C-alpha cells in the first residue's frame, strides 16, 4: 500500500499544480478554454493508477479495492487541501454559473470524488492491464 499512498499524493499535487497553472494562464475566466481544460486533470489519476497497478501487485480483489480506496483517499485529501487553498486564498471571488464558490464544499466534493474514482479505477485498471489477483 506504500505505492498507493505515494501515487495518491502525486495525483493530488499534480491536479493542484494543473489548477494553479490554469489560473496563471487565465483559463478560469468566464467563457474561456478553462471550461474544458479542467478535464485534462483526469489524466493524472489514470496515469498514476496504471503505474500503481503495474508496480504493486495484490493477492485478492478485496485488496485491489482497498488499494483503490487508499489511492483515492490520499489523492482526495491532498487535492482537497489544494482546492481549498485555491478558492480561499488565491481566487476567493471565483464564480461559476453566476454564483461564488464555497472553498469548503469544493474541497469536500473533491475528496469524495477522488475516493469514489480510486475505488473504481484501480480494479478496472487491473482488468485492462491483466494484473489480476490470484484468488478471491
Language-model segments: what does each one mean?
Residues 1-55:
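Transmembrane alpha-helical insertion/packing segments
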Residues 81-100:
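Functional transmembrane-helix hotspots
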Residues 100-120:
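Hydrophobic alpha-helical transmembrane segments
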Residues 52-64:
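Membrane-helix interface/capping segments
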Residues 1-3, 126-136:
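Short, charged juxtamembrane terminal tails flanking transmembrane helices
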Amino acid at each position: 500500500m506504500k505505492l498507493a499512498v505515494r501515487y495518491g499524493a502525486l495525483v493530488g499535487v499534480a491536479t493542484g499544480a494543473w489548477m494553479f497553472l490554469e489560473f496563471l494562464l487565465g483559463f478560469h475566466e468566464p467563457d474561456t478554454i478553462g471550461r474544458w481544460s479542467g478535464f485534462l486533470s483526469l489524466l493524472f489519476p489514470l496515469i498514476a493508477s496504471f503505474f500503481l497497478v503495474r508496480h504493486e501487485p495484490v493477492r485478492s480483489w478485496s485488496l485491489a479495492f482497498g488499494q483503490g480506496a487508499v489511492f483515492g483517499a490520499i489523492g482526495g485529501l491532498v487535492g482537497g487541501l489544494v482546492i481549498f487553498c485555491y478558492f480561499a486564498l488565491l481566487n476567493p471571488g471565483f464564480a461559476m454559473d453566476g454564483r461564488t464558490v464555497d472553498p469548503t464544499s469544493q474541497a469536500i466534493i473533491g475528496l469524495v470524488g477522488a475516493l469514489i474514482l480510486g475505488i473504481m479505477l484501480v480494479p478496472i485498471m487491473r482488468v485492462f492491464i491483466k494484473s489480476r489477483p490470484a484468488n478471491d
